């Protein structure tokens, strides 16, 4: 929003439609191979062989999601330390939260889905509400920005070419639409629910991001949104909107977002490596499950690996962010 203002909603909508077509493809593949554990990796295995499948799974999912999880849980620990626990090391907070979600996922997909439903409901509800307050200009601050007076024109953003260049950025807001696939076999009606869940998720994300973006442009100038001195334009918006209460609320939203990512990565990556173990692309120990059907080896290895990165302090460095964006 900071670079091209509300024009960003156009590439956001276009990318949502493109991701819906991707969702249709995944739903069709799931219909053809409904019992696979690893999802994308086993689709690649059937179509291209073991080596592309191994490389694709590790590079596109396992490594990327480990780095994503590290960044999210580190941010979550920093926010909790800053808001509620100033005297506790943020690394300890992060590892405790990771351990909590490890236990939740060890109880199987039923507990995972119940926790995820609660987290997502609170997250989406909070984002919509804080966005609508901004859209309707109901904040306690009198510092309402006159967006129309400073809005960039179609020519200033580079026209159609400029809009297309921001589609790449918009794609990041829809990453993970296919993460339903590794747990699809545990659904009661996967033929219906796989595509339906992806469709609902995409529409909700578009709606929430649009509302939040419009709200932000009413209380924060485009220059600050693009180049916030603190590097946290969402916190600046919340503070301008509702003062210290807004800052705390946005901090809680940040924690909920991290919790959702952590929970999803645990569930999806453990199932992906389980599928790879079943196909002989990973040690067979990864294919083992506990009595509740959870791929416990993958879950524990994921916890140990990420906890080690966090404990070493690497999770708070720019290196993780650089690798993640790369």
Question: Predicted regions: what is each one?
Answer:
Residues 59-74, 174, 179-186, 245-284, ...:
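Membrane-helix boundary/coupling elements in multi-pass transport proteins
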Residues 14, 83-111, 123-130, 144-146, ...:
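Transmembrane alpha-helical segments of multi-pass small-molecule transport proteins
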Residues 12-16, 25-28, 54-67, 98-102, ...:
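Hydrophobic alpha-helical transmembrane segments of multi-pass small-molecule transporters/permeases
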Residues 41-45, 49, 82, 199-263, ...:
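TM-loop-TM module centered on a large, flexible mid-protein loop between adjacent transmembrane helices
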Residues 87, 117-251:
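Helix-loop-helix junctions that connect adjacent transmembrane segments
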Residues 1-9, 75-91, 110-120, 249-252, ...:
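Transmembrane helix-loop boundary segments of multi-pass membrane transporters
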Residues 7-12, 53, 90-94, 98, ...:
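Residue-level signature of transmembrane alpha-helical entry/exit and packing/kink sites
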Residues 1-93, 201-204, 211:
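Extracellular loop-to-transmembrane helix junctions
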């Amino acid at each position: 929003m900071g670079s091209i203002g509300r024009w960003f909603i156009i590439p956001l909508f276009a990318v949502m439609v493109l991701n819906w077509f991707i969702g249709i493809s995944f739903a069709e593949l799931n219909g053809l191979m409904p019992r696979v554990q690893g999802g994308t990796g086993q689709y690649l295995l059937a179509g291209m062989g073991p080596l592309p499948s191994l490389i694709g799974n590790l590079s596109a999912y396992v490594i990327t999601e480990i780095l994503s999880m590290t960044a999210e849980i580190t941010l979550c620990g920093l926010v909790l330390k800053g808001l509620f626990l100033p005297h506790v090391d943020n690394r300890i907070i992060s590892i405790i939260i990771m351990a909590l979600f490890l236990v939740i996922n060890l109880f199987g997909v039923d507990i995972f889905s119940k926790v995820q439903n609660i987290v997502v409901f609170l997250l989406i509800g909070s984002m919509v509400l804080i966005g609508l307050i901004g859209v309707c200009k109901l904040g306690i601050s009198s510092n309402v920005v006159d967006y129309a007076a400073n809005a960039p024109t179609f020519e200033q953003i580079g026209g159609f070419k400029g809009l297309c260049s921001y589609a790449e950025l918009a794609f990041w807001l829809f990453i993970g639409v296919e993460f339903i696939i590794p747990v699809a076999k545990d659904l009661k009606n996967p033929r219906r629910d796989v595509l339906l869940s992806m469709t609902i998720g995409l529409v909700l994300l578009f709606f929430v991001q649009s509302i939040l973006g419009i709200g932000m442009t009413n209380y924060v100038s485009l220059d600050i949104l693009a180049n916030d001195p603190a590097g946290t334009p969402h916190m600046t918006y919340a503070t301008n909107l509702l003062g210290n209460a807004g800052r705390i609320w946005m901090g809680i939203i940040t924690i909920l977002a991290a919790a959702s990512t952590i929970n999803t990565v645990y569930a999806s990556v453990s199932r992906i490596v389980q599928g790879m173990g079943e196909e002989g692309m990973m040690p067979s120990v990864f294919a083992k499950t506990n009595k509740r059907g959870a791929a416990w080896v993958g879950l524990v290895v994921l916890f140990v690996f990420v906890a080690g990165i966090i404990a070493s302090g690497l999770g708070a460095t720019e290196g993780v962010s650089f690798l993640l964006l790369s």
